[in-house]
Design a protein with these regions (language model features):
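Flexible, glycine/small-residue catalytic loop immediately N-terminal to the helix bearing the conserved Tyr-Lys
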Residues: 1, 32-33, 50-54, 76-77
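Active-site helix of classical SDR
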Residues: 25, 61
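C-terminal helical subdomain
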Residues: 85, 103-185
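Residue(s) in the substrate-gating loop at a strand-loop-helix junction
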Residues: 45
């Protein structure tokens, strides 16, 4: 019973924050495709990118939007449909009590709006996650290290453990636009 009740609490959050974007994207997609032009902006969250205590459902939905953005951008590229994500920091009911009032006062919608407008403009990038916080703007990227290749017969948990520092060496990290680890490069 507890699991069923928990799922009932989780579902509306997923419906609003993930499925709402899926449904809206499906509604506009054929029109954008026919026009040979379109812009879609997903609203992700630091809870989806970095995690946050007590927000598993919300964080999962917001992380799901990044996957949705990536797939829709690939599918829409040939029709100049550009899909991006905005990661705003704003003073909301969810952030009340988490930060001092002086900080919340800086987290205005007006400081986020320019980023949103850029991401849907004619000059919008493609497949970009843009963070907007109190007048600060930064690109958020998913990176992959160069990693290591283990030949067949050496692919064991122990071999991975022995080379884990090398696998995780961020000095070799690169921004990836498509999948492909060390074995595929």
């Amino acid at each position: 019973e507890a699991q069923a009740a928990g799922l009932q609490e989780e579902t509306p959050v997923l419906d609003v924050h993930l499925l709402g974007s899926v449904i809206c994207s499906q509604a506009v997609w054929p029109h954008m495709k026919a026009a040979g032009f379109g812009r879609i902006l997903m609203t992700t969250s630091t809870s989806g990118i970095y995690g946050n205590f007590g927000q598993a459902n919300y964080g999962a939905a917001k992380a799901g939007l990044i996957g949705l953005m990536n797939v829709l951008q690939i599918e829409g590229a040939k029709n100049d449909i550009r899909v991006n994500a905005l990661c705003p920091s704003a003073a909301t009911r969810m952030t009340e009590g988490l930060m001092p009032e002086s900080v919340l006062a800086l987290l205005t919608p007006e400081s986020v709006t320019p980023a949103a407008l850029f991401l849907v403009s004619d000059d919008a990038p493609r497949r970009t996650i843009l963070s907007a916080c109190a007048g600060g703007y930064a690109r958020v990227v998913i990176q992959e290290t160069a990693g290591v290749f283990l030949p067949e017969g050496e692919r064991t948990p122990e071999a991975i453990a022995a080379r884990f520092d090398e696998i995780c060496d961020l000095s070799t990290a690169m921004h990836c636009e498509e999948p492909g680890g060390p074995g595929m490069r």
